[in-house]
Design a protein with these regions (language model features):
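Active-site "substrate specificity/gating" loop of NAD(P)-dependent dehydrogenases
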Residues: 44-48, 70, 148
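Residue(s) in the substrate-gating loop at a strand-loop-helix junction
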Residues: 38
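C-terminal helical subdomain
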Residues: 78, 97-128, 132, 139-141
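Short C-terminal tail/terminal secondary-structure segment
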Residues: 43, 122, 133-153
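Short, flexible catalytic-loop segment of classical short-chain dehydrogenase/reductase
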Residues: 59, 80-91
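Alpha-helical segment proximal to the catalytic Tyr-Lys
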Residues: 15, 67-71, 130
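Active-site helix of classical SDR
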Residues: 10, 54, 62
């Protein structure tokens, strides 16, 4: 699902965007593709090799598609969330001790909210982000800064 599902969706979207072309009254771009990745696109995760590998695959999928579709005025980017308060990671923040341990990985010292991701997606789909393509934007409170090295390693 992580990689194949996104490939199938973006393939069909790209076909439709190319068919329609740019419609200046709607947008500067013919289309915008937003992939969902994760901080594990760049942070290894032992014990979760299949997940981390699929997220690395999403990065290359998105970058290759961005390169291929840019001449058609189609932008492709990814959002790479860190810890977001959703049911899938509830066990990592079930108790105050577990949440404190999770927050040691997040320099900004808070778990993200689904609205954080939604707001970024809305912005990436807007003409305000028209010159951005082929990029993963990490929405992670600084997890990808590797906070364990903040004190000099």
């Amino acid at each position: 699902v992580n990689l194949t599902g996104q490939f199938l969706c973006l393939r069909e979207a790209a076909r439709e965007f190319i068919r329609r072309g740019v419609q200046p009254e709607i947008s500067k771009a013919a289309g915008k593709i937003i992939c969902m990745s994760s901080v594990h696109e760049v942070i290894p995760w032992g014990g979760h090799v299949n997940y981390a590998a699929s997220k690395g695959g999403i990065m290359q999928l998105m970058k290759s598609v961005a390169q291929e579709l840019a001449p058609h005025k189609i932008r492709a980017n990814s959002i790479g969330p860190g810890a977001i308060a959703t049911p899938i990671n509830l066990s990592a923040r079930d108790t105050p001790e577990e949440e404190k341990a999770l927050l040691t990985l997040i320099p900004y010292n808070r778990v993200g909210n689904p609205d954080d991701v939604g707001n970024l997606a809305a912005w990436l789909a807007s003409d305000e982000a028209d010159y951005i393509t082929g990029q993963t934007i990490f929405m992670d409170g600084g997890m990808t800064l590797y906070p364990g090295f903040a004190e000099g390693g």
